[in-house]
């Protein structure tokens, strides 16, 4: 009897699970980055599948900037409790002491101190030699040219001109002490693949991905949700209740909402089939300077 041909999503799933298992077997101290978004939720689901019925054999790490949506933090804690994985949370103590804020210090400085430097602090603190990330090649041009196994030197920096060849899904994970590999098991997935897989597997998500009335203000052509009382309002500026959802999630002052009526997975998938814009257009950190994402990745950002 001929072997059953795998569907497109089954092929992607099998590839990702193979990568996750290979890293767990090859490296001494791996970690999975957990940003609480849809890609992280899919990656967590794949890791649970990869080692079922056992537990995930490595911790999950959330680098908390102290400016995430409240619903994201609540969802993170609920997931850790429900699935019983080890959750590490790191906040840059120097950044907290300095009172770093995206409003007062700008997106570039906030991202560098609270995310990039915070991430490097956590990786050094725990001595991780491999870190899973949920980035996909279709998201952004600098990520499109990055390998599945992305080598980082002892300073956690990335050199796009010095990447290792990956032939026939053969990955080179050799590192010296202090060096590490960033691993992207979702590299070959698209945003639509992610949503179709979430629907197929019934994966839980932060409610922010679904349309509902939310208080927003318009700034620089983007709708920013007023998530807490730390957000300064200009004179005469009043939040308006708009029917919106988020395609991508990050720090709430730096993440734009979109008008949408998609309040179910089916409606979101239908919306994705019609859209012609990138999900990253809703992230201010991708446009705060020229070649923004590649520069951040060279400095140690995921």
From Swiss-Prot:
The keyword ATP-binding applies. Its EC number is 2.7.7.4. Transmembrane segments: none annotated. Pathway: Sulfur metabolism; hydrogen sulfide biosynthesis; sulfite from sulfate: step 1/3. One of its GO terms (biological process) is sulfate assimilation. SUPFAM superfamilies: Adenine nucleotide alpha hydrolases-like. InterPro entries: PAPS_reduct_dom (IPR002500), Rossmann-like_a/b/a_fold (IPR014729), SO4_adenylTrfase_ssu (IPR011784), Sulfate_adenylyltrnsfr_sub2 (IPR050128). Keywords: ATP-binding, Nucleotide-binding, Nucleotidyltransferase, Transferase. It catalyses: sulfate + ATP + H(+) = adenosine 5'-phosphosulfate + diphosphate. CDD domains: Sulfate_adenylyltransferase_2. The keyword tRNA processing does not apply. It holds the Pfam family PAPS_reduct. It is an enzyme of class 2 (transferase). One of its GO terms (molecular function) is sulfate adenylyltransferase (ATP) activity. With CysN forms the ATP sulfurylase (ATPS) that catalyzes the adenylation of sulfate producing adenosine 5'-phosphosulfate (APS) and diphosphate, the first enzymatic step in sulfur assimilation pathway. APS synthesis involves the formation of a high-energy phosphoric-sulfuric acid anhydride bond driven by GTP hydrolysis by CysN coupled to ATP hydrolysis by CysD. Belongs to the PAPS reductase family. CysD subfamily. Heterodimer composed of CysD, the smaller subunit, and CysN. PANTHER family: SULFATE ADENYLYLTRANSFERASE SUBUNIT 2. This is Sulfate adenylyltransferase subunit 2. It comes from Shewanella pealeana (strain ATCC 700345 / ANG-SQ1). The gene is cysD.
